[in-house]
Amino acid sequence: MFSGASAINLDAKGRIAIPKRYRESLHACHNNQLVITVDIQSSCLLLYPIHEWEQVAAKLASLSDTQPTERAIKRMLLGYAHECELDGNGRMLLPPPLRQYANLDKRAMLVGQLNKFELWDEAAWQQQIEQSRIAILNEDLAANERLADFSL
């Protein structure tokens, strides 16, 4: 389970280093293997441990090739999907098309989302957080059945 937001940097070769706090789990449970793809709703990347990606791929396989929206989702997620393995220093190379999609240049944020990570350009992440905060403040949470009794 992954949580927390970590500021990270891309090196000159387009590599990121996964923070140490996640590396042991990625090594022990997922053999250092990840799949990177795009987020179809935001300008960020999604990093799935290989076993989590297999579940996503099974869901994608169930989508129709004849229904345009379903086909477009498959095309985006599978077309950009890139398998990678962490090196001995916990680094992974981000392919140029994926870096371009998420506008990643130097400074980035790696955000744990339970079963996966999101990878954001740092400025885009800050903007997204502010937009989310405002949206939550303006939302009538009681009107949302799923959130009406939600408490932390």
UniProtKB/Swiss-Prot annotation:
It comes from Shewanella pealeana (strain ATCC 700345 / ANG-SQ1). It is found in: Cytoplasm, Nucleoid. InterPro entries: MraZ (IPR003444), MraZ_C (IPR035644), MraZ_dom (IPR020603), MraZ_N (IPR035642), MraZ_sf (IPR038619), SpoVT-AbrB_dom (IPR007159), SpoVT-AbrB_sf (IPR037914). The lineage of its organism: Bacteria, Pseudomonadati, Pseudomonadota, Gammaproteobacteria, Alteromonadales. Residues 5-52, 81-124 form the SpoVT-AbrB domain. One of its GO terms (biological process) is negative regulation of DNA-templated transcription initiation. Keywords: Cytoplasm, DNA-binding, Repeat, Transcription, Transcription regulation. GO terms for cellular component: cytoplasm; nucleoid. It comes from the Bacteria. This is Transcriptional regulator MraZ. Pfam families: MraZ. CDD domains: MraZ_C, MraZ_N. Signal peptide: none annotated. Belongs to the MraZ family. Forms oligomers. Its main location: cytoplasm. One of its GO terms (molecular function) is transcription cis-regulatory region binding.
